[in-house]
Amino acid sequence: MQVPFFMADGEEQEIIFRLGAGKDSNEASSIAKQFRGAQVAADALDKVKKYWEQTTGALQVETPDEAINIITNGWLTYHTLSSRLWGRSGFYQSGGAFGFRDQLQDVVSLLHTRPELARQQILLCASRQFKEGDVQHWWHPPVGRGVRTRISDDYLWLPFVTAYYVKHTADISVLDVSNNFLEGRLLNQGEESYFDLPIDSLKSATLYKHCVRAIKHGLNFGAHGLPLIGTGDWNDGFDKVGEHGKGESVWLAFFLYEILKSFAETASLHNDLKFSDTCKNEAKKLKTNIDENAWDGEWYKRAWFDDGTPLGPKSNGDCKIDSIAQSWSVLSGGGNESLVHTAMESAYKNLVQKDIGIIKLLEPAFDKSDINPGYIKGYV
């Protein structure tokens, strides 16, 4: 937008630009008329400023590092809302779709600033769950056309964030809000994903039952007693690790362990002691299987391929060590107390490069061996 104008020496002028959107030309015209005039524009701008001051000022920290203070006291919250929740865009993907896990994990950071937005996103995501328990990996509003996949962690973010929300807000009422399930065809054998518009099922359930269904859907384990990775976990690029239904994920084991622990408490609050006990028992078994199978001497493995080949052992030419398998051994409490310090020391030693200021996600990159974990190998 541009406006030509002339100014004399010492003269001041105020130019107001109005930018908005409507569903059609009539709505756009109506909105534009509401914001005519300098005072109306000034009031609208002041309202925006106050919104951001209240939102970003709700949580303040003070540390000896001014850079940390700046990024924490406002910038991260602003970025989460404007870019992640509203803009939904990035350098690699500028599609504007809602990602099931993406925006759920983002709203966790808003629990102390805009908890109502976290609640809203949780309920929105519950409405994108298929009746079988899996979910749309991503979808485009307003109609909801999106992709159904075999990715193994998406649906588990619903109980994870719900339990976290309830714990930090004490808003138990959200568990009783109902949402319909989605219905769509199941993935065919050998089919990794498909893009389609599902229909709203006539069947509905409370948020609590949506979460229970997600957890039950995730209790599928492989030969080592760890969760099946499917065609990717938190790392979508590992889409070939478990494409034939047998590959397992160590990171997902830690994540699921955390969910089982936290949702056991949520189930108790909801007076579902039977499912609370189920979560506790499954968590206990999972921790035993992690202890017996996932350790590789100095750090935790990352996964196993369908054929039983481990991903993340010291003997690998590629991805000898993966960051999130080490960090989540601590974050979840699922790692062996006598081993997690060694795991984190190994991560620091192998992944932190102070000279160039980066922390690698894994090391070495997938560029030496014939191992094909998926499209992560195509990133440059």
Outline where the language-model segments fall.
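Acidic, mature catalytic/reactive cores of soluble proteins
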Residues: 1-380
